[in-house]
Amino acid sequence: MAVGSFVALGDSFTEGLDDPRADQAGYLGWADRFAEMLAARQPGLRYANLAVRGKVLRQVTEEQVPRAIAMAPDLVSLAAGGNDLLRPRGDPDALAEHFDEAVRTLLMAGCQVLIFTGFDTRFPVLRLIRGKVAAYNMHLRAIADRHQCRLVDLWSMGVLYDPCAWSADRLHLTPDGHRRVALRACEVMDVPSAADWREPWPAAAGIASSPARAWLAARRTDLRWARVHAAPWVARRVRGVSSGDGIGPKRPELLPL
């Protein structure tokens, strides 16, 4: 199927955090990068990105899905549910039912749907929700199979297990992490690309340290992460505030690149 228009839906992952633009404010991210790769093969491609950081699945389906349908795009990407699973009451089974309904709604509107699973992040704190993410991913794979949708399985992308793929907050990808996801999306969508997302990361330079020193350095990094990133996130949850409050989509109209 030729793709002449593409709308990206979701949260901070699809908005593009932490992949800052070099030429202007805001973020690039995998979706922008994928759209550029797609446009190189499909001149005149129109693209919109309705994703906003902090959004939970219900907000994505209620606020973004109807707007996407109104644009009548050929392709819609849907990556959502991660913010729900970070919450203690996040239920992967209930989320999957909601996700399936959104996919069916998009398909009935004539859109092709590109689904993303959740990541297998291996940092100590996020490991606490690993089981919930795994269960949710099983549902997402079943949804993709049931509706014959293309699926980008982020969990199986071993190259993203490397800390180099993740920014300091351990929740968002680095620019090269986003680039690799865009390349994987191209592969799933049969879009030729010159690079390979499996390419090994550059070898880390530095002086080798003893296991004890390495352990201490890792714990210092964990403490700094808790102070700089985890504590503010918890404080926002207590106040009922989202990082996306007051922020609109970065590319709300379906326009040529």
Question: Where do the language-model regions lie?
Answer:
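Structural beta-sheet core signal
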Residues: 8, 78, 114-115
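Oxyanion-hole/transition-state-stabilizing segment in secreted/luminal serine hydrolases
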Residues: 15-19, 43, 57-94, 121
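Short glycine-enriched, charge-decorated loop/helix-capping segments at active-site entrances
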Residues: 19-25, 90-93, 128-131, 167-168
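A short helix->loop->beta-strand "cap" motif at the edges of active sites that frequently abuts
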Residues: 108-113, 149
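Conserved catalytic region of serine esterases and O-acyltransferases that act on ester linkages
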Residues: 146, 176, 180-257
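Charged helix-capping and loop-helix junction motifs
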Residues: 92-100, 130-137
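Substrate-gating cap/lid alpha-helix
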Residues: 123-155, 175-179
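Serine-esterase "nucleophile elbow" of acetyl-processing enzymes
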Residues: 1-53, 65-72
